[in-house]
Amino acid sequence: IGNVAEFAFDGTGRWLAWVVDAQGKTGNGIQLRDMETGVIQVLESDEAQYRRLAWADEEPALVALKAVEDDDFEDPLYSLLAWQGVDGQGMPDRIELDPMEEEGFPQGMTISPNRSPRWSDDMEAIFFGIHEAELKEDAGQEEETGEEEQGPEEEPEGEPEDRPSRSGSDEIDEDEEPELVIWHWKDPRLQRMQELQASRDRNFSYLSVLWVEDGEFVRLADDDVENVSPARTGPWAIGRDDSEYELMGNLDGRRYQDVYAIDMRDGSRERILERSRWSNDISPDGSHFLYYEDGHYHTYEFATGQHRNLTAEIPTSFIDTEDDHNVEDPPVRPRGWTEDGENVLLYDGWDIWRVAAAGDDFENLTVDGKDEEIRYQGIIQFDPDDEPGYDLSEPLYFRMYGEWTKKSGYALMTDGRPGPPTCSRAWGPVSAPNCLRS
């Protein structure tokens, strides 16, 4: 296969998709090969460029970006392409979003090539980025070629030896020019940080979503709330805005943000947290959002708008007393969710606790960590491509460390019931290597 710019296998390894990018754009497109039969199918062909080819995680579906040149714009204009039912049974269903033809698309903006589009886990939506499209200078504008009429040049005042030199002999050599960095005291980011993040700023795009069933386009992020994180499934997202606190955060290290619940069906948002220091993530089922405040973990339920304190009744503390940063009552970081989204796994520095997202139930899974001074530091997830969250009905491997014995190793819990995971302990006075599954 020649002129291949990108390629990607699906999760099963049966289907190979690739982008053809030939000189002169002749024959450009996206093609698909069945690795079992060798049959090749052309999904798309046009005098255009194609980028960001990607498969959905579980279903036979593709997504990509298509770029065409436009004489009125500095850069190519992109549209979104997607296919469902890529299984060799006829031509798959094709989906396209062209900003030039979409009535609800923001004026003066286009799809960004700097963010990879992706399918949602439930296959109901496609996420992608948009940014401003830069227009070329008006070709009809007449260039001014005349020069302003200038009067006779005035002789500079002062004695000849005091007058500025016209020969250029007194000019400063470029290598000796002083470097001057001007920082305004109201800039929210320090000058050095602006320099370090310049590339990120240039490539920034606003998250948007296309709902597949009705073809509805919804913009999720804007200048008021730039940082948006969608749930893996369902219609909710979390937006974060630190504009009110960014300057002081860069000066004293205490970074706060306002947090919004966003309905991705229509883009409406509601502020649910103000001046929040620690917000975490959305549950795998998209129903709850976890955050930490005033020494306790809380959840916010999207459907009801209800906040619940999860840890007020638990007989332990989740404050990290060993963290000496310039913040009050920092938390010990959570260890994740159960895969059904019904429980969050919290760590108090010794034991790992299962706490219901509804706030009505909890239990200590490892039990003896604090009493035996063993730190069950985390749960091992062998495959990073596994479903988000942990299945408590399956065997769980814990990383463990003896606070005073300095032993380290791993423990296995097989039944998901609370109790010391002693059924299979492997540890000793050594630095335990990474635990891998064959």
For each feature predicted by the language model, list its residue ranges.
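Beta-propeller folds
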Residues: 1-438
